[in-house]
C-alpha cells in the first residue's frame, strides 16, 4: 500500500506581500485549473494526485495554524497530523511516519512517499510519484529521491551556492 505524506508547515513567505507568516503561499488561489478556475497550490496538488490515484492514502503533516486553511480548501479523504511546534522537515516526516505506523495501521512493507504540499510540477511528475511503489516493492530500491531539474541555483531552496573570490574556483 502507498501512503503519501504531504508536508505543509512552512510559513510560505516567498510571495510577500501576498503571503506572510499567517497566510502561507500554498493557500493563495493564484493558479488556474483546467476549467480556468482559481485554485491554490494545495488544491492543485490534491487534484493532480487524485487524477492519478483517487484512492491513495494521504496524510498531511502540518501545524495547528494551517489546519483550518487545509480543511477549507480540501474536503476529507486525508488524515491530518499536527506538529506540536514547527521543527522543520525531518521531525515533521518522523511524526507523520509514527502516526502512519501507530495510529493509521501502516505495515512494514508499505511504501511511504513524502513531498511538499506546494510543489509545482506537471502531471507527468505525479504520474511518476505513484509509480515509485513499483520500484520499492520490486526491491529495486528501498529509498528513492525524486525531484525536478532546477532551472537555476538558489540558496533559498536549499541548493548549495558556491562562494566566489580568492581561493574559490
Placement of each model-derived feature along the sequence:
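Conserved beta-loop-beta/alpha segment of the NTase-like Rossmann-fold superfamily
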Residues: 75-166
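N-terminal glycine-rich phosphate-binding loop and ensuing alpha1 helix
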Residues: 1-70, 76-87, 99, 126, ...
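Proteins with a high burden of low-complexity, intrinsically disordered sequence enriched in S/T/G/P/A and R
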Residues: 16, 167-169
Amino acid at each position: 500500500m502507498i501512503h503519501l505524506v504531504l508536508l505543509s508547515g512552512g510559513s510560505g513567505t516567498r510571495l510577500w506581500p501576498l503571503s506572510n507568516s499567517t497566510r502561507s503561499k500554498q493557500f493563495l488561489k493564484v493558479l488556474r485549473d483546467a476549467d480556468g478556475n482559481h485554485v491554490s497550490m494545495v488544491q492543485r496538488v490534491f487534484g493532480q494526485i487524485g487524477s492519478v490515484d483517487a484512492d491513495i492514502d494521504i496524510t498531511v503533516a502540518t501545524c495547528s495554524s494551517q489546519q483550518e486553511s487545509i480543511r477549507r480548501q480540501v474536503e476529507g479523504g486525508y488524515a491530518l497530523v499536527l506538529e506540536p511546534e514547527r521543527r522543520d522537515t525531518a521531525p515533521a516526516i518522523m511524526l507523520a511516519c509514527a502516526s502512519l505506523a501507530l495510529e493509521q495501521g501502516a505495515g512494514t512493507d508499505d511504501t511511504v512517499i513524502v513531498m511538499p504540499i506546494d510543489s509545482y510540477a506537471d502531471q507527468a511528475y505525479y504520474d511518476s510519484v505513484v509509480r515509485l511503489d513499483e520500484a520499492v516493492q520490486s526491491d529495486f530500491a528501498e529509498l528513492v529521491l525524486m525531484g525536478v531539474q532546477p532551472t537555476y541555483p538558489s540558496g533559498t531552496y536549499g541548493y548549495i551556492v558556491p562562494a566566489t573570490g580568492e581561493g574559490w574556483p
